[in-house]
UniProtKB/Swiss-Prot annotation:
One of its GO terms (biological process) is double-strand break repair via homologous recombination. It comes from Ajellomyces capsulatus (strain G186AR / H82 / ATCC MYA-2454 / RMSCC 2432). GO terms for molecular function: 5'-flap endonuclease activity; crossover junction DNA endonuclease activity; zinc ion binding. Its EC number is 3.1.-.-. It comes from the Eukaryota. This is Structure-specific endonuclease subunit SLX1. Belongs to the SLX1 family.
Amino acid sequence: MDNIPQSINPIPAFYCCYLLRSTVRHASLYIGSTPEPSRRLAQHNGDRTGGARKTSSEKLRPWEMVAIVSGFTNRAGALQFEWAWQHTKESRHAEVERCESEQLGTRGSSRTGKEVKRAGKPRTSLPNILENLHILLRSPYFSEWPLEVWFFSADVWQVWSQPKGNLLDNSIKVVTAFSSKEAGDTNRREILGKRIETLDTGYDALIEYVEKSQFLLESEEAIDCGVCKQRLNPRNDMIAICSHSLCRCASHLLCLSAHFLEAAGFIGKLIPKEGTCPACLGKLEWPTLMKEITLRLRGQEEVKRLLGRRRRTEQVGKRKISNHVSSEKGESEASMPSTDAKTMALPIRSHPSVGGSNFGKLGRSVGSAIRTNTDNGSVKAVTPEIEFYRRRKCNAKKNFSGLYSTPRINISDWDNAEIIE
């Protein structure tokens, strides 16, 4: 679609509400919202500029992020949930029973039998805050949102898991990101910080999805809606593409929404949470489809930046592979036996009958690879292996002639000379 105003931003890649707890005083808790949990946690701990007044006390630092609620499609929705989580009693989304249970209760006195006022749970206690979260996620308003709850601390998860009456809707995912061995770990803050840093808060997971959609819609191929079978107009229609890499199914957004709601039995609602592709029957999540559509139509600059970064990453990877292959090739060539006689050291085995002088001649003959032809003055290269083999071949003879033979004594002519008296 070409009539989308460029001032409208795509759906944020990530936005969450979070729960902080002081590692010094566990009773001190804080609720906030952010698109970048790792950066925000560093601000609260004073490692970066920013933060909040309630978390600025050095007596309470460092803070740890023990739970988050993610899946918000815009900043306004996250701020709305944050306020409702902080002021559940005043929120119109909380159940009436919750408001009544927070009022001061009564109990009978064991001495007089009269009813006396009993103080309720502190509003800022961990069980109270998690109970408020449970109530909001069960409310008719927020239960329709595609929210996920993440827990990074085992003890907080245990408090959450305690019975709270009604159950959550199955569509709300609850994720535990901790191990059972972390309770007494001295590096707890470092472990939690690393877990927060590993959260996927960008569009990197969608870039291949957007590339496939652009290639499919920008081609000259005629495409029909996967639901109503009518011809799609990429310039005017809001089109949703299947998120599975091998599926080319495209549908009108309203057609696909109606298909999902009808299959789930949610007649009368407008926004589904998930469904199955009409073509490949694969599971599709509605927030993922909407993120891709808004990123493709409203975030062209972001798509260009992501594609450029990915190409640079691929080029760096190719260079590393090329350098690694070249280094391995060089090492293999260096490990091969060299044919240069000047650097070659062949093992020379001596025979028991070989004297020291003859052994030296053999070594010099092997070490010399270049000889000069005295007849024509040309240089003749002699392979050391061949020269060595020729001289060792004489070693098989019993009389050890040649280099290994015993020195011959020439008979002088003076032996036959006539003696003159």
